[in-house]
From Swiss-Prot:
GO terms for cellular component: plasma membrane. Its main location: membrane. Belongs to the UPF0397 family. HAMAP family: UPF0397. The keyword Cytoplasm does not apply. InterPro entries: ECF_substrate-spec-like, UPF0397. Keywords: Cell membrane, Membrane, Transmembrane, Transmembrane helix. This is UPF0397 protein SAG1634. NCBIfam families: PRK13661.1 (NF010182). It comes from the Bacteria. It is found in: Cell membrane. It is a multi-pass membrane protein. The chain crosses the membrane at residues 9-29, 42-62, 74-94, 109-129, 148-168.
């Protein structure tokens, strides 16, 4: 195994563990049943941007599956899949962000937030509700209400928390041209 693969496997494990812990400890209820404000999606976005789509997918998928299994006894697979897809979609745009070389510019932050809002809308407002209807025979009105609210709260969570995490990470990295030879 090369060093990059090992780094990504370790990142996936750490990301999934953080997803589980934060998801179980910070659960802010909303007026719609079985729909909570979940702060772990900010961490998922951070891992997807830093390590790419594979780590993003598996962090969300494994983290959500294990969190549901521990918390509820069994995973709700359509939502588990969407957590993975959210990490995957955000991770695909990671190379467009110059976080490793030049920090986060306003353009990078705008792109990140446009991508995460679109990914949230596709995942929670389309994939999750249709999956719930098809696989679980859930009522359409219920799952679309849950999906739209999840899109909104997860977009806000990632927009605020994910942006702050990315800014903190970018500031911790040496910037291109910041090191000079004495």
């Amino acid at each position: 195994m090369n060093t990059n693969t090992i780094k990504k496997v370790v990142a996936t494990g750490i990301g999934a563990a953080l997803f589980i812990i934060i998801g179980m400890l910070v659960n802010i209820p909303t007026p719609i049943p079985n729909t909570n404000i979940q702060l772990q999606y900010a961490v998922l976005a951070l891992f997807a941007v830093i390590y790419g789509p594979g780590v993003g997918f598996f962090t969300g998928f494994i983290g959500h599956a294990l969190k549901d299994s521990i918390q509820y006894g069994s995973p709700w697979w359509t939502w588990v899949l969407v957590s993975g897809l959210l990490g995957l979609m955000i991770g695909f745009f990671a190379k467009k962000l110059a976080i490793q070389l030049s920090g986060m510019t306003k353009k990078d932050l705008l792109l990140f937030n446009v991508v995460q809002v679109i990914a949230n809308l596709i995942g929670w407002s389309v994939v999750a509700p249709y999956g719930d209807i098809f696989f679980y025979s859930e009522p359409a009105s219920k799952v679309f209400a849950q999906g739209f609210l999840s899109s909104l709260v997860n977009s806000i969570t990632i927009g605020v928390g994910g942006t702050l995490l990315l800014l903190a990470y970018a500031k911790s990295r040496p910037q291109k041209g910041s090191l000079s030879k004495d």
